[in-house]
Amino acid sequence: MGNVYTKDIKRVARELYDKFKDQASDKYDDNKKLVDEYVNVSSKKVKNRIAGYLTRYVKISKNKVEAQEASEELEEDLESET
């Protein structure tokens, strides 16, 4: 069963991803440093949750891009065969 995150944690993680897409990583420790650097939160638990959700969000985003590229390649292959 997955974790349930509040809207605030999701919002902050998405904003971080949008602003610092090139620095966001699929590694938790790297994202933890990113959160420490750019987010002003005093709670360690909240920082860790934001970093964890950001990690998952990056992985999901990468998978979507890869799937979209694969489907485009497949469409191109099908068009070239006909």
Curated annotation (Swiss-Prot):
<dbReference type="InterPro" id="IPR036401">
    <property type="entry name" value="Ribosomal_eS17_sf"/>
</dbReference>
<dbReference type="GO" id="GO:1990904">
    <property type="term" value="C:ribonucleoprotein complex"/>
</dbReference>
<protein>
    <recommendedName>
        <fullName>Small ribosomal subunit protein eS17</fullName>
    </recommendedName>
</protein>
<dbReference type="GO" id="GO:0006412">
    <property type="term" value="P:translation"/>
</dbReference>
<dbReference type="GO" id="GO:0005840">
    <property type="term" value="C:ribosome"/>
</dbReference>
<dbReference type="GO" id="GO:0005829">
    <property type="term" value="C:cytosol"/>
</dbReference>
<keyword id="KW-0689">Ribosomal protein</keyword>
<dbReference type="InterPro" id="IPR018273">
    <property type="entry name" value="Ribosomal_eS17_CS"/>
</dbReference>
<dbReference type="Pfam" id="PF00833">
    <property type="entry name" value="Ribosomal_S17e"/>
</dbReference>
<dbReference type="GO" id="GO:0003735">
    <property type="term" value="F:structural constituent of ribosome"/>
</dbReference>
<keyword id="KW-0687">Ribonucleoprotein</keyword>
<comment type="similarity">
    <text>Belongs to the eukaryotic ribosomal protein eS17 family.</text>
</comment>
<dbReference type="InterPro" id="IPR001210">
    <property type="entry name" value="Ribosomal_eS17"/>
</dbReference>
